[in-house]
């Protein structure tokens, strides 16, 4: 993971310039300079090119690796990692990389909190000093400049950059699966499954089959006209889109093929079946000429447009040198695209598109999909980091338990009905961090059902939710919106001092659905149908009675989404009550949020005026 930090560290100042001074010079030049772990990109007006190259040369010869900057990057990485813990897309990316390449291959490495903690400034320095050397670098300059001018500027500004022997690393060669194999990463309650049919591919850049396979891949899943999109979305409406991609690579089996879809949970197995069917069809049937010509025309058009971008021209020039490609590869690109025949497409499909030899990865609700996936191959459950999860079944349901008694047990565990009924008002303050900024969330409730939520940052209110028991509104950034009928019912429920006491009131229906695992512990799953018709799944720890998780789905412009909330570390609070010290929430518009309890005040005499 430390290689991902190199670019940020290098552009955080030099030994003679602070980060602000460095960025100010770039701004004054109107220039761009971005650095990754494998290269540098720069852009400026011609008159400023010498000054920009001087800045880049300074970065390469006298970088200032800052511990403060590294600490900030590690903190940001951990924050992003926390969001990934409940993100099916991230789950899919991780497990796909690990299965295709293995954990000991650089392409199969997955960042974890443990790996972030191991990153040191010394390791970052050593990587830079070892691999950032001119004798293994290529430079392409595109613009209104001749060779003599370019050579003079490069020699002037990079002359102090020292050559050094660079070690050549070797890696274990990835192996395609022996047949079809299914890998599932569980996302309990997910209403969609992220599907990927994938495997490593052995093809170097510039190989004779590369252009032919690009045509084949485009016909299969290169966009909205691709067969996957037309099948899964237009014909069956299982997904918003389905696509395929192919990537060549200089390492043996370092390339990959991938056919993806974000399918409704109920259609997960059907989506996989149709993806495999379309892959096989390309191997066994000649592509109609109009479809073939249509995609070849598209490739020709995008290639021509790409030539207008100087960055693309630079990349092409470097590719031919770096990968030892034919010198006329790009010169003859359009001619070679046009020469691809339907027979060529079928032949490369038979060679490289292998539905029977693939990893079928699915990030979704294993309870809903695992059994159905067995028809495609052996099923293995993995965690986010690619470790095999032992699928231990939950305990059997006791015969003398009911949904009502489970909810009552939670009330008793958190203080009891009598203690909760003595609460006339309560102010709960929680804090969280988002993108390095501290945010406070203050929630004030007053019996019977008044509520005020104030989200603020550095003393400035970002959003308010106000409900006076009958009506309410939401305000923020100078805008105010009154609640509609559905919102009024929603916040009337949320204004209850204890959610569980509201569940036992008339109008709510409780249904015990079984026992599920929550963080390896057994929990009763109770489906609650509120008086307003909304449904929420609540999970209560079998041993302690505490609520440990909630799931609620809602329709959004992007489709149905599930918001999951975890309640952790119940501790004694005021009034003889117990409260979770940490609440984690995912699936909302802001990704994963971790809120920590700062304070709770009870019966302080809250005025009705604040709810107006």
Role assignments for model-derived ranges:
Residues 1-10, 17-62, 74-82, 88-114, ...:
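M16 family metallopeptidases and their MPP-like homologs
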Residues 4-6, 26, 40, 52-56, ...:
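Buried hydrophobic packing residues in well-ordered domains
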Residues 62, 66-67, 147-148, 160, ...:
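Short beta-strands and strand-coil junctions in structured, solvent-facing domains, enriched
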Residues 94, 121-157, 357-358:
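Non-catalytic, conformational "gating/processing" segments within enzyme and secreted inhibitor domains
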Residues 115, 398-412, 469-534, 542-544, ...:
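Flexible, processing/modification-adjacent segments and terminal tails
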Residues 138-203, 364-394:
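An aromatic/glycine/proline-enriched structural segment found at the starts
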Residues 405-479, 506-512:
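N-terminal mature ectodomain segment of secretory-pathway/periplasmic proteins
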Residues 456-461, 522-611:
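Gly/Pro-enriched, hydrophobic low-complexity segments
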């Amino acid at each position: 993971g430390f290689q991902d930090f190199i670019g940020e560290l290098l552009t955080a100042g030099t030994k003679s310039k602070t980060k602000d001074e460095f960025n100010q010079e770039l701004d004054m030049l109107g220039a761009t300079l971005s650095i990754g772990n494998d290269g540098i990109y720069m852009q400026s007006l011609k008159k400023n090119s010498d000054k920009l190259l001087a800045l880049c040369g300074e970065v390469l010869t006298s970088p200032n690796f800052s511990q403060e900057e590294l600490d900030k990057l590690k903190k940001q990485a951990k924050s992003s990692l926390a969001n990934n813990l409940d993100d099916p897309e991230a789950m899919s990316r991780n497990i796909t990389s690990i299965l295709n390449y293995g954990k000991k291959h650089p392409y199969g490495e997955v960042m974890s909190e443990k790996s972030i903690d191991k990153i040191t400034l010394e390791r970052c320095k050593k990587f830079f000093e070892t691999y950032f050397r001119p004798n293994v670098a290529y430079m392409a300059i595109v613009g209104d400049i001749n060779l003599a001018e370019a050579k003079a500027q490069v020699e002037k500004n990079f002359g102090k950059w020292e050559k050094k022997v660079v070690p050549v690393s070797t890696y274990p060669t990835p192996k395609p699966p022996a047949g079809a194999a299914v890998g599932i990463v569980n996302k309990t309650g997910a209403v969609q499954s992220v599907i990927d049919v994938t495997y490593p591919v052995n093809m170097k850049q510039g190989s004779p089959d590369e252009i032919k396979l690009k045509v084949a891949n485009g016909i299969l899943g290169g966009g909205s006209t691709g067969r996957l999109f037309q099948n899964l979305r237009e014909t069956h409406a299982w997904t918003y889109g389905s696509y395929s991609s192919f990537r060549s690579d200089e390492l043996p089996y370092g390339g990959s093929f991938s056919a993806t879809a974000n399918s409704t949970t109920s259609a997960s197995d059907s989506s996989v079946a149709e993806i495999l069917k379309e892959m096989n069809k390309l191997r066994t049937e000649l592509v109609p000429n109009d479809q073939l010509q249509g995609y070849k025309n598209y490739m020709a058009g995008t290639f021509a447009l790409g030539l207008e971008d100087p960055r693309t021209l630079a990349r092409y020039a470097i590719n031919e040198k770096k990968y030892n490609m034919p010198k006329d590869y790009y010169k003859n690109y359009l001619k070679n695209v046009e020469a691809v025949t339907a027979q060529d497409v079928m032949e490369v499909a038979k060679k490289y598109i292998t539905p029977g030899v693939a990893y079928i990865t699915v990030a979704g609700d294993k309870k809903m999909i695992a059994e159905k996936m067995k028809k495609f191959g052996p099923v293995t459950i993995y965690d986010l980091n690619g470790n095999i999860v032992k699928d231990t079944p939950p305990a059997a349901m006791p015969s003398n338990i009911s949904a009502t008694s489970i909810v009552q047990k939670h009330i008793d565990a958190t203080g009891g009905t009598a203690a909760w009924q003595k609460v006339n008002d309560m102010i709960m303050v929680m804090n969280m961090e988002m993108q390095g900024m501290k945010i406070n969330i203050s929630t004030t409730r007053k019996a019977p059902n008044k509520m005020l939520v104030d989200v603020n940052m550095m003393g400035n209110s970002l959003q308010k939710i106000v409900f006076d028991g009958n009506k309410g509104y939401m305000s923020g950034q100078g805008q105010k919106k009154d609640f509609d009928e559905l919102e009024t019912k929603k916040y009337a429920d949320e204004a209850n001092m204890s959610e569980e006491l509201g569940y036992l009131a008339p109008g709510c229906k409780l249904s015990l659905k079984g026992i599920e695992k929550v963080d390896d512990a057994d929990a009763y799953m109770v489906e609650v149908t509120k008086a307003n018709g909304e449904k929420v799944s609540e999970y209560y720890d079998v041993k302690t009675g505490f609520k440990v998780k909630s799931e609620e789905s809602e329709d959004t412009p992007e489709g149905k989404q599930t918001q999951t909330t975890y309640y952790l570390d119940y501790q004694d609070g005021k009034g003889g009550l117990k409260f979770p010290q940490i609440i984690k929430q995912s699936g909302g518009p802001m990704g994963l949020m971790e809120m920590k309890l700062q304070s709770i005040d009870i019966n302080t005499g809250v005025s009705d005026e604040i709810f107006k």
